[in-house]
């Protein structure tokens, strides 16, 4: 019995260590190499297949300097205003999320920063549990320790979901506006950013009043968005 208990404890610990070693190796690789596809992309494409949707993956890597500053500012203004200064976690946002989750009795809000969102996109799935959030935090800490802010943001810009099968700034710019990501205007960047929290909902409701309102809010906040210091775009 004692041996069985030891195995029951050792097995999940071993899996955790192995997975994080695998993740860390990939984080090191992604400092210089673009991901072929992310875990979230694979999960989504499998989901679409199971739903009987005829969706092809549209994912086009674009270097950081060739993505519009307008889009960078819009995303920071909307998703993570403190991105340039924090170490991967917005503790005020996390505390607010914990309160909302406690009040609802479910894991709904995450207080996720851009770095945390990237950790999820690269390596995890869309499930909402405290275990998954813990793994997300561990990956975020590893990534922030060995990857500069520009690269984290570059990976994020290229992995965001914007429509059915459409991932990354370049694919989204071509899909919605038939232009490269480098040429996005402030209005276009704000509208793309407004889709980020619920891309598939807005894909099905493109004329949503909520989308228009969110676009206007992003436009107002863009002027105060702070990019990473090394960004000379």
Swiss-Prot record:
Compartment(s) of residence: Cell inner membrane
Main location: membrane
Annotated keywords: Cell inner membrane, Cell membrane, Cell shape, Cell wall biogenesis/degradation, Glycosyltransferase, Membrane, Peptidoglycan synthesis, Transferase, Transmembrane, Transmembrane helix
EC number(s) from the headed UniProt entry: 2.4.99.28
Family matches, as InterPro entries: Glyco_trans_51 (IPR001264), Lysozyme-like_dom_sf (IPR023346), PBP_transglycosylase (IPR036950), Pep_trsgly (IPR011812)
Family annotation (SUPFAM superfamilies): Lysozyme-like
Biological-process GO terms, alphabetical: cell wall organization; peptidoglycan biosynthetic process; regulation of cell shape
Pathway recorded for this protein: Cell wall biogenesis; peptidoglycan biosynthesis
Reaction(s) catalysed by this chain's protein: [GlcNAc-(1->4)-Mur2Ac(oyl-L-Ala-gamma-D-Glu-L-Lys-D-Ala-D-Ala)](n)-di-trans,octa-cis-undecaprenyl diphosphate + beta-D-GlcNAc-(1->4)-Mur2Ac(oyl-L-Ala-gamma-D-Glu-L-Lys-D-Ala-D-Ala)-di-trans,octa-cis-undecaprenyl diphosphate = [GlcNAc-(1->4)-Mur2Ac(oyl-L-Ala-gamma-D-Glu-L-Lys-D-Ala-D-Ala)](n+1)-di-trans,octa-cis-undecaprenyl diphosphate + di-trans,octa-cis-undecaprenyl diphosphate + H(+)
Segments passing through the bilayer: 8-28
Enzyme class: transferase
Membrane topology of the entry: Single-pass membrane protein
Any GO molecular function: pentosyltransferase activity
Organism superkingdom: Bacteria
GO CC annotation terms, alphabetical: peptidoglycan-based cell wall; plasma membrane
Role according to the record: Peptidoglycan polymerase that catalyzes glycan chain elongation from lipid-linked precursors.
Protein family: Belongs to the glycosyltransferase 51 family.
Protein name: Biosynthetic peptidoglycan transglycosylase
Gene from which the chain derives: mtgA
